[in-house]
Amino acid sequence: MSYRIGIDIESISDVQAAAEKHKQFLDKVLTKSEQKQLAGRKGNGYYAYLAGRFSSKEAYAKATGFGIGSKVNFTDIEILDDENGAPRLSVSGRSLFLNAKSYQISISHKIKLDLVATEVLIEVEDGNSDS
């Protein structure tokens, strides 16, 4: 096995400003299921959730080495909370990282510091870590 790691840090208020400025931000960044989970958030939790998802998708793109753009779209990456509230990452479409055995994700919010930090770990079958 080999591993690919992506890490990202975002300002919650910067993500909030982008969402408020660009009407299509939510549709561009979040899947419909993620938007449903977001709708249940109130107050600071709303933008912390949004920033966490945005940052997680950036971290995934970094782990693959593709970046967001021609091979990786935000909405091909979905991070939903499981029954215990832990984030679970799934990938579809062009963003699927071939030979990936598993995806692990960690999202840390520090609202008082206006930061969200994320890490994505991709476990890759030996022999080919490229898609």
Swiss-Prot record:
It is an enzyme of class 2 (transferase). GO terms for cellular component: cytoplasm. GO terms for biological process: fatty acid biosynthetic process. Keywords: Cytoplasm, Fatty acid biosynthesis, Fatty acid metabolism, Lipid biosynthesis, Lipid metabolism, Magnesium, Metal-binding, Transferase. It catalyses: apo-[ACP] + CoA = holo-[ACP] + adenosine 3',5'-bisphosphate + H(+). Gene3D superfamilies: 4'-phosphopantetheinyl transferase domain. It is found in: Cytoplasm. Its EC number is 2.7.8.7. GO terms for molecular function: holo-[acyl-carrier-protein] synthase activity; magnesium ion binding. It holds the Pfam family ACPS. InterPro entries: 4-PPantetheinyl_Trfase_dom (IPR008278), 4-PPantetheinyl_Trfase_dom_sf (IPR037143), ACPS (IPR002582), Ppantetheine-prot_Trfase_dom (IPR004568). Mg(2+) binds at residues 8, 58. Its cofactor is Mg(2+). Transfers the 4'-phosphopantetheine moiety from coenzyme A to a Ser of acyl-carrier-protein. NCBIfam families: acpS, pantethn_trn. Belongs to the P-Pant transferase superfamily. AcpS family. This is Holo-[acyl-carrier-protein] synthase. It comes from Oenococcus oeni (strain ATCC BAA-331 / PSU-1). The gene is acpS.
